[in-house]
């Protein structure tokens, strides 16, 4: 009898684990669907304009004078993020600069407009159920984040003032094409050695897009996760051809897609070349990163894929070839 029970347990436990993982994927898809609906609803109410940080150098939008002094696009968006936190939480979020907020914090613009969440920060449902540490940050008071840094539960990135924003982190990134310029001398590009970061310069300008800027909305990704947390047996970087994950498309739909089925993408610094693509290294950069598939410290070379779509918002990620000229 004991042997039979042990056999049943050995059979049922893996199935139970798979069922729980499948349930977490359903929750993730529901969260992304909520994000896609909010993204589309915002555009409908804003006469076509997309939700993204919009402040520019020289703007005087904040009631706090220190948040009106930025001299570049990056810092203007930092000021806007700090302003949102102060207004929505009545907490004096310290000013910070030098961080590209458009990657993991753009949902705050939707929250500020009442399109997602319940009028409070942090917003529930913007962290993947499999993304362990941001879930911890969301439950941590901003002034206590440094204790998580010390215990290697939060990254030592940016200033202490910036790290107070981590409770508002989202697993789901808005692709650069939605908020960066198309002009090679004003756009951003991928850091070659750090998969997390973008390279930007003194001439970098961030822009605001419209919903009708998408030439192929059902084929263009807008929100993605840097990692496949649900489909592969082990968490893997999104750009590996074997990875797959739920993605939010510009038409508001959420679909699970395989990276190998996506187009290769482009190099935004060389947009006229049909052969140039964004190529960079994936390697372990922070405490919770999965190892590269090669198992080496050097890491693996990957393509940008739907993170760096050819022709930006005018391009195609899935279900068709890359246009040979800008649509």
Model-derived features: where do they sit?
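Amphipathic alpha-helical segments typified by the pilin-like N-terminal helix
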Residues: 1-33
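Short, well-structured segments within or immediately adjacent to enzyme catalytic domains
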Residues: 29, 34-327
């Amino acid at each position: 009898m004991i042997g039979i029970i042990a056999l049943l347990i050995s059979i049922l436990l893996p199935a139970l684990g798979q069922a729980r993982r499948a349930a977490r994927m359903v929750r993730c898809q529901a969260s992304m669907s909520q994000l896609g609906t909010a993204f589309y609803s915002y555009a409908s109410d804003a006469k076509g304009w997309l939700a993204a940080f919009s402040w520019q150098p020289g703007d005087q939008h904040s009631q706090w004078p220190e948040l009106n002094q930025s001299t570049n696009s990056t810092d203007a968006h930092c000021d806007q993020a700090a302003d949102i936190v102060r207004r929505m939480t009545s907490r004096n979020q310290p000013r910070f600069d030098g961080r590209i907020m458009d990657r993991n914090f753009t949902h705050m613009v939707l929250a500020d407009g009442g399109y997602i969440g319940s009028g409070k920060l942090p917003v529930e449902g913007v962290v993947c159920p499999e993304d362990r540490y941001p879930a911890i940050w969301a439950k941590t008071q901003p002034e206590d984040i440094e204790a998580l840094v010390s215990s290697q539960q939060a990254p030592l990135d940016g200033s202490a003032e910036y790290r107070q924003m981590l409770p508002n982190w989202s697993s789901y990134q808005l692709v650069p094409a939605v908020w960066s310029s198309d002009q090679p001398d004003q756009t951003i590009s991928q850091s070659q050695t750090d998969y997390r970061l973008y390279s930007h310069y003194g001439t970098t300008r961030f822009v605001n897009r419209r919903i009708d800027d998408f030439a192929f909305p059902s084929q263009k990704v807008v929100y993605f996760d840097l990692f496949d947390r649900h489909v592969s047996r082990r968490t893997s970087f999104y750009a590996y051809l074997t990875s797959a994950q739920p993605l939010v498309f510009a038409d508001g739909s959420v679909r699970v897609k395989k990276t190998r089925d996506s187009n290769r993408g482009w190099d935004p610094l060389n947009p006229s070349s049909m052969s140039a693509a964004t190529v960079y290294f994936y390697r372990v950069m922070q405490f919770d990163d999965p190892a590269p598939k090669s198992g080496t410290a050097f890491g693996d070379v990957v393509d940008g894929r739907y993170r760096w779509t050819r022709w930006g918002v005018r391009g195609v990620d899935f279900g068709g070839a890359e246009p040979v000229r800008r649509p």
